[in-house]
Amino acid sequence: MNSTPVLEMRNIAKAFGKFYALKGVDLTVYPSENHALMGENGAGKSTLMKVLAGAYTATSGEILIDGKPFHIRTQKDALSAGITLIYQEMQLAPNLSVAENISLGSELSHGGLVQRKEMLVQAQKVIDRLGAQFNASDKVMTLTIAEQQQVEIARALHRNSRILVMDEPTAALSSRETHRLFELIMRLRDEGMAIIYISHRMAEVYELSDRVSVLRDGQYVGSLTRDNLNAGELVRMMVGRPLSDLFNKERDIPLGKARLNVHHLTDGGKVQPSSLLVRSGKIVGLAGLVGAGRSELAQLIFGVRKATGGMIEVDGEPVVIHSPREAIDLGIGFLTENRKEQGLFLEMAAAENITMATLERDARWEAQTISDDAIKLLNIRVPHAQVRAGGLSGGNQQKMLISRWVAIGPRILLLDEPTRGVDVGAKSEIYRIMNEMARKGVAILMISSELPEIVGMSDRVYVMHEGSIAGELNGKNITQENIMTLATGVNDAHS
């Protein structure tokens, strides 16, 4: 690692009136480094980066570039220092071409006229350097979110940026798009760029980061190198308590009756004949690698996918589920994996999202009471129930969707990646909600790709491999090692 930091932020404070969002924060970043910045919502990550990018002016503190003090009061100052911030919400002009967006503010001109042909040539060179699949002449509005993100990165390269800041860049990307972004980030790092990466997704941080710095309550807590990365320590740094405290699994519930019993359920394709049991008051984990068939099995139970064989029992009675409505009528709720595409209505009010599953059953005049009660029970942070769902944080959106199923008075909850895309504080609250529902006798089937979550929350774990249940784990046998052994098809774990 280069001994001279490309960036040092020393004792940075930022006040909004009497409230201090940043309280003497330090951050050091080196050339050719992927540096993750972590912390709960409200920890100060985005505020610190906006100070760096000139969107905010620091109340006090200093910034050094290549070891020399550099005053950043405006975005122009930041650009002159080689700093580019890519926000969560793209800062692009959709009606303009890719080339025009890349060159915006630095257009080639001669005699007062923009040299469009040369602008296209220069923009295409940058696009080709990224390996992007679009052209400089394409309109930005025709591109996918991932491609628009590449345009933002291309603009940074066009400006000869040396420090690239990305704020939650994978929030709206598919797994394939995320993989491509990671490949690009690693390539840029190898070319000498310093990349600051704001994320709360542990898997991404482990895959990308050379170092991780953590903020909590507007203060710098510390940094860990790649060699010292540890999920438990990161969580402790972010929330001030150990990872084990997040799960709070001490439910002490006696063995309940078989609430959900699935026998040899299959769709003849993605899901081979699969059986599992979830008892009243228990949380059962469903683990496996991406593509193993976990989500598809949950969709079969909920009636989203058509079963070609097998049987489902609810409270000991055989049931036939052809549709989600039939599942809901049986007291089954389903939190989908992708809340923004399959579950959440972003333009609708929080109250309408919460009562979506109960409107056919309850009078509309009851909706306000139902939503108000759910907001209090799940501690959803909204100014009022009519606020637009799309304006809420990821954690509050997820709690809102969980509350939709709490509102139906469920017997069974199917939760597919219940804490995906939320910060550690929101995770802790979702775990609290799950434990409370289990104490009330709800049977919960939880799909998760986060092994600490599976181990920490589950009373029993089923592991899927290539569309089939590869094994079942109980008690002390629920370990990350045993789960991965089953998930990868090496079937020597003991249940």
UniProtKB/Swiss-Prot annotation:
Keywords in alphabetical order: ATP-binding, Cell inner membrane, Cell membrane, Membrane, Nucleotide-binding, Repeat, Sugar transport, Translocase, Transport
GO molecular function: ABC-type D-ribose transporter activity; ATP binding; ATP hydrolysis activity
Domain ABC transporter: 7-242, 250-491
EC number: 7.5.2.7
Coiled-coil annotated spans: none
Keyword rRNA-binding: no
One GO location term (cellular component): plasma membrane
Enzyme's top EC category: translocase
CDD domains: ABC_Carb_Monos_I (cd03216), ABC_Carb_Monos_II (cd03215)
Top-level taxonomic group: Bacteria
Subcellular location: Cell inner membrane
Function: Part of the ABC transporter complex RbsABC involved in ribose import. Responsible for energy coupling to the transport system.
Subunit text: The complex is composed of an ATP-binding protein (RbsA), two transmembrane proteins (RbsC) and a solute-binding protein (RbsB).
Protein name in UniProt: Ribose import ATP-binding protein RbsA
Organism, scientific name: Shigella dysenteriae serotype 1 (strain Sd197)
Taxonomic placement: Bacteria, Pseudomonadati, Pseudomonadota, Gammaproteobacteria, Enterobacterales
